[in-house]
Structure formats: C-alpha cells, structure tokens
C-alpha cells in the first residue's frame, strides 16, 4: 500500500512538473486569455466543453458582488490576492502538498451581472480537475455569502 501511494505521488509530481509555464495572466482586449490545449484550465469564455464553465451570476451592484467575491476568496486557504482593480481580480492559490500555484482571474461584467473567470495551473498538463472543483466551490460559496 505504501509503495503504491509513493508511486502515485511520484507520477503526480512528474506529470505536474512537465510542460511549460503559462503566459502571464491579465485581461487582453477586454477578455481573459484563452485556455491552452491542456486540461489544467477552466474558463467562462472557453468554447469547448473540456474547459468551459458557466460564469457566476450576481444581483445588486458590481461593488457588492466584488465585496462578496473578495470575502469568499479571503475565506479560502493558501490564497493571495495579487491584483484587485474592482472589475478585475487576480488571485494565486497554492496547493497544500506540493505548493503548486494556480492563477485565477475574475472579471466583473456589470452589464450582464456576471463574473467571468479563468483558472489555470502554472505548470504541468493535468491538474486532476482541481481548477474545475475550486471554481465550483467558489460559485457555491458566493451564492451563500451575504454582506453585513
């Protein structure tokens, strides 16, 4: 059992460290960068099912949605808000075990009352669904979060 676990962890490490680092995050021409071909990225702007997720819907003002989003992010472990410009928030999530860093970007679209996002691993090819699960969790927490 211990050998199997050790072998699995070694394979995970090798798969995660292979590949190239993603290009820098940010909004380009008003849009989040597209996901690469690898499965370690999800985005509300992706056209293919492998990478596509629905945006987070909100009611109220953009400022209230922003406050709720930041509150959710701050409640999650191993997070660092790198950039917070109101309409755009860039967060780095660090994994507990191997300290892998994932870039998550949010863009608030007040006209549509949507929060678009892109969540991508910096290294490797597969993330075993971590980015998708994280964004599903953020969406659930956002829906339950209220402001005082």
Model-predicted regions and their roles:
Residues 18-148:
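Ser/Thr-rich, low-complexity intrinsically disordered terminal regions
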Residues 8-11:
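Classic N-terminal secretory signal peptides
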């Amino acid at each position: 059992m211990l050998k199997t676990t050790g072998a699995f962890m070694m394979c995970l490490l090798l798969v995660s460290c292979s590949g190239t680092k993603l290009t820098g995050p940010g909004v380009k021409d008003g849009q989040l960068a597209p996901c690469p071909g690898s499965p370690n990225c999800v985005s509300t702007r992706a056209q293919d099912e492998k990478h596509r997720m629905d945006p987070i819907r909100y009611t109220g003002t953009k400022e209230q949605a922003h406050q709720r989003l930041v509150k959710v992010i701050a409640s999650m472990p191993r997070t660092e808000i790198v950039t917070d410009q109101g309409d755009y928030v860039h967060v780095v999530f660090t994994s507990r075990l191997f300290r892998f860093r994932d870039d998550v970007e949010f863009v608030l679209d007040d006209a549509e009352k949507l929060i678009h996002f892109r969540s991508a691993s910096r290294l490797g090819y597969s993330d075993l669904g971590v980015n998708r699960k994280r964004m599903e969790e953020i969406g659930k927490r956002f829906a339950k979060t209220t402001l005082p």
